Every structure is written in C-alpha cells, then in structure tokens.
C-alpha cells in the first residue's frame, strides 16, 4: 500500500472514530436543535421535529447524559438551551445545573412536537422547525450525524447543501466512503503495515472507552450487566477468564452510556456502542495476553477499520444491530492477537456472519449491553474457531468463499432485506401503552 493511500485511510479513521457524549441519535437531534436555536434571537415557543423512523427508533428509550431522563424532548430542549452547534457530538457535554433546569421548563411547556417525516428520505434524517412570534429558524441533518445540510433564519438560507446531498448515491454512502472504498485486503494491509507512530492515535479511543467502563463499575447503570459478570453469581457460574473480563469491560461501558451517564466515549461510524464494542474487547484481551504496544495498536486499528469498512456498505442506520458489525471487527482484532494469519482473520469474519447475522435493532436502550455481550461472546468463539482453522463454508447459509462477498451478503440483508422488519419494530415500539 502506498503512502498516499495510507494517509487517506488515516484521515478516514479520524473522521469516523470521534468522541461522543450520549447516544448519537438523540445527540444529533440536539445538535440540530442547537443549530436552529443559535439563529434565533429569542427562545422558541413552538418546536416541530420531523425524523426518519430509524432516528426515532434509536432516540426513544435511551438515557440523556447528566439528566436522569430518557428520550427526545429533554435532548431537544437541551440543544435549544445550549445553542452551540460547534460542539458537534459533544453538544450535551458539560451541561450546567441551571441549563438543565431551563431545559426541563421547556419540556414541561409542551412546546416540542415530534413526528415521523413522511416521504422518500434517508435513514438518517432530522428536521427541526422552531418559531417565536414572527421569528423562525430551521435545520436539516442528513446521512451523517453531524452533516447539517440546511439552516435558515426567517426564510433566509444560512446553509444549503441539499443539492449536493441529492447528487450523491442513494446507497449506503458517505463523505468518507467517497474518499476511499475499502476492502478486506486493504483493511488488513493497512493495519499490518502502516508505521505504528502514525496510527497509535487509536489508543485515545481505548483510553476514553476504558474510562466509561470504570465509571460504570463504580455506579449502578442500566441493567448493570458488567457488574453482574464480576459479581458473586457471575464469578460462581461464569468464572474469571479473558472472556468474562472483556465482557465486563464492554458491557459496563454500554451500561453507562445507555443509561445516560455523563461520560464521553469514542464512537465508530456514528455509534458509541460500535466504538465501545470495536475497542474494549480487543484492549482487554491485549492486556491479558500482555501484547506489546505495537500489537495492541495494530489490533485496535484492525478492529475499528473493519467496522468502518462494513458500515460503508451497510449505512449509518439499519435494521441490523450495530453490535453485529462492531463485534465482527473485534473478532478480527482478537484473532490477530492470538497469532492468527490473514486467512484465519478472514475465517473469523465468516464465522461471525454465519452466526449472528439477523440480530435486529430495536432502538438504543439499556438492554443494548446484553446484545453487546452476545456480540463479544460470538467474537471470541469465532476467533477461537478460526485459530483451529474451522470456518463456516459457502455451503452454509449466506457465507461465501470470498470474504468481501460474505460482507456484501451481510450488509445487503441489513440494508435492504430487513426494511419490513424495521417498520414493524418501530410500529411495535410506538404503539405500546
């Protein structure tokens, strides 16, 4: 791989692996609210929020950092109060008590109306229209959580990238994908051969996500899956092993994040849980194996870049649980740390695809830590089987002899084949009494 290609991939990783405070879907809605509010001279007395079904699904039941509350209204209200879109996915970071009280008053005022946007829209679509008397402001985010394609104040356009967005492919594409289209060969080559000093920035993801795990273990967040694994019953029946330690690391960070703990994690491809799942199992196993600095860095890069590659094909949001993708990345990192060859790492990918493809996404919520645990367990099993040169073959289900084609099969199911499932899941979620 030439130096130019390496630099383009480094730029891609730095674009896709970024800090985020809170679940990225409600945070993205808060960002849109902050953008619109930043244009207003007065506090709005009416706020209309129109969302794609996938955004609504992922924002309904998740905790909002530092509030003790769940769901969209408080996230939107905080965005209005903060009114600082330059903070991007950290727009809810460092909320002051007086800001929270002001946001709660906005929620209590019932000025926020949330609905599904009708028509042919991207799976990641957020539109906010707010007004106060004769003053108004609007914002649209599309395709990427921070991609503000439109903003206007009193009908005067401030930002307009809608035509550019319309010209892009309607497939699961993004700016980063247009820069460089990855493959299994490229991901492996980059992770193995790029100078370590140029990719060791990935250790910041390990540091941030480990911190989230440590915060969680000191508290009682969500379903406390991580604490359960390390508790008396967990140790009695699950034991103490590399697997249980990586499960603890990963699930506890997810516990905290989904319950709204005020922690910043390093996301991957727009998802904090994907960043956690791509990072912490690999970090935990590297520590257990006493892997040196270089091997740890390369394993983390291999895992995270594999997630980016699969998400290029799948899209930012889908009916497929993101932990399937992220755990596939971590399985690659685990296999590498076990001494696996390129062929065996490919086996690990096929084993993952042959196992947990089809795990559906029913929104971001505390129980995501249980799905993450399932993904991490499968990642370990898939890597171990690969080391034994055991692999799901092309005679079995959707797996193909070619690794890239197997990934294509996985992503086409999540992107195209599960759309009816996605609709049914949202209908069930929104019709519960």
Swiss-Prot record:
Record-annotated disulphide pairs: none
One MF annotation (Gene Ontology) recorded for this entry: L-cysteine desulfhydrase activity
Swiss-Prot/TrEMBL GO biological process terms: L-cysteine catabolic process to pyruvate
Organism superkingdom: Bacteria
Name of one Pfam family that matches: SDH_alpha
Family the UniProt entry places it in: Belongs to the UPF0597 family.
The name this protein goes by in its record: UPF0597 protein PG_0909
Lineage: Bacteria, Pseudomonadati, Bacteroidota, Bacteroidia, Bacteroidales
């Amino acid at each position: 791989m030439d130096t130019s290609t390496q630099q383009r991939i480094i730029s891609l990783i730095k674009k896709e692996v970024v800090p985020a405070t809170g679940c990225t879907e409600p945070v993205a809605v808060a960002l849109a609210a902050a953008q619109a509010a930043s244009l207003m001279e007065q506090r709005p007395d009416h706020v209309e929020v129109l969302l794609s079904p996938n955004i609504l699904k992922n924002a309904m039941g998740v905790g909002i950092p530092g509030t003790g509350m769940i769901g969209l209204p408080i996230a939107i209200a905080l965005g209005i109060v903060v009114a600082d879109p330059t903070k991007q996915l950290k727009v809810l970071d460092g909320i002051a008590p007086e800001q929270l009280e002001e946001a709660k008053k906005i929620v209590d005022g019932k000025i926020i109306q949330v609905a599904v946007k009708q028509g042919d829209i991207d799976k990641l679509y957020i539109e906010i229209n707010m007004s106060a008397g004769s003053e108004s402001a609007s914002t649209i985010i599309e395709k990427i959580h921070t991609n503000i394609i439109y903003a206007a104040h009193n009908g005067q356009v401030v930002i307009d990238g809608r035509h550019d967005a319309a010209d892009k492919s309607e497939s699961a594409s993004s700016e980063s994908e247009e820069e460089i289209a990855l493959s299994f060969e490229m991901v492996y080559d980059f992770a193995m051969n790029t100078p370590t000093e140029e990719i060791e920035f990935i250790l910041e993801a390990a540091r941030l996500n480990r911190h989230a795990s440590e915060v969680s273990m000191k508290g009682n967040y969500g379903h406390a899956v991580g604490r359960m694994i390390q508790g008396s019953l967990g140790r009695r029946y699950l034991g103490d092993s590399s697997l249980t330690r990586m499960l603890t690391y990963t699930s506890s960070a997810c516990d905290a994040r989904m319950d709204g703990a005020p922690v910043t994690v390093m996301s991957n491809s727009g998802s904090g849980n994907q960043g956690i799942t791509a990072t912490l199992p690999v970090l935990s196993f590297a520590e257990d194996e006493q892997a040196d600095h270089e091997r740890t860095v390369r394993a983390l890069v291999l895992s995270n870049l594999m997630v980016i590659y699969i998400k290029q094909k799948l899209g930012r949001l889908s009916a497929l649980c993101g932990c399937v993708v992220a755990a596939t990345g971590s399985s690659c990192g685990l296999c590498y740390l076990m001494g696996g060859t390129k062929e065996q790492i490919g086996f690990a990918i096929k084993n993952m695809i042959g196992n947990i493809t089809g795990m559906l996404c029913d929104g971001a919520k505390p129980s995501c830590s249980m799905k993450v645990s399932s993904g991490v367990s499968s990642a370990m099993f898939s890597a171990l089987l690969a080391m034994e040169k055991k692999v799901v073959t092309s005679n079995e289900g959707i797996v193909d002899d070619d690794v890239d084609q197997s990934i294509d099969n996985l992503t086409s199911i999540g992107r195209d084949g599960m759309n009816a499932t996605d609709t049914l899941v949202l209908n069930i979620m929104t019709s519960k009494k």
